[in-house]
């Protein structure tokens, strides 16, 4: 047998036209705590509710936004379905929503609420990328760090100090 010879088998399925049968994905329900924390977080953080046209679902302890018309992925290994929004941190008595890095990167300009805009040549940008805290006046809470208008990651402002939430593996 020569390298490259062999057989290929594929099962095709009709996706449009008459008599189409597509299974929809089954989503895991979102806990009441998670939904409450997500809504509180998004109201406090964004100027416009992101992913409002998508369905919320849980994969383990993580909250995802998935398009409603996603076909079933049963039998396929999907690295990630939808956008990871975040997870709950803290105790069961006092849970808090912790946003994911992928959420920051998926946000559109019109959805961004509180933000810290940095220029590409700003020394604060280098400090942020290295994991240091930044000084910035403003309202306490989560904010998106942006460079030239594009989201880079999260920070959490408390008493005019922005705590760095840039993922350690990317620093």
Whereabouts are the PLM-identified features?
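Conserved beta strand-loop-helix elements of the APE1-like EEP
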Residues: 7-15
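Polybasic, low-complexity RNA-engagement segments
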Residues: 15-171
């Amino acid at each position: 047998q020569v390298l490259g010879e062999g057989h290929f088998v594929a099962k095709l399925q009709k996706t449009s036209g008459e008599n189409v049968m597509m299974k929809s994905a089954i989503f895991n329900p979102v806990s009441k705590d998670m939904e409450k924390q997500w809504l509180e977080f998004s109201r406090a953080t964004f100027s416009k509710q992101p992913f409002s046209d998508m369905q919320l679902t849980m994969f383990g302890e993580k909250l995802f936004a998935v398009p409603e018309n996603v076909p079933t992925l049963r039998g396929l290994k999907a690295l990630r379905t939808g956008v990871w929004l975040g997870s709950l941190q803290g105790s069961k008595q006092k849970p808090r929503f912790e946003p994911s890095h992928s959420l920051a990167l998926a946000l559109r300009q019109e959805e961004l609420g509180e933000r810290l805009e940095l220029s590409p040549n700003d020394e604060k940008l280098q400090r942020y990328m290295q994991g240091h805290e930044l000084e910035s006046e403003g309202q306490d809470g989560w904010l998106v760090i942006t460079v030239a208008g594009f989201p880079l990651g999260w920070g959490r402002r408390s008493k005019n100090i922005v705590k760095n939430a840039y993922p350690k593996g990317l620093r």
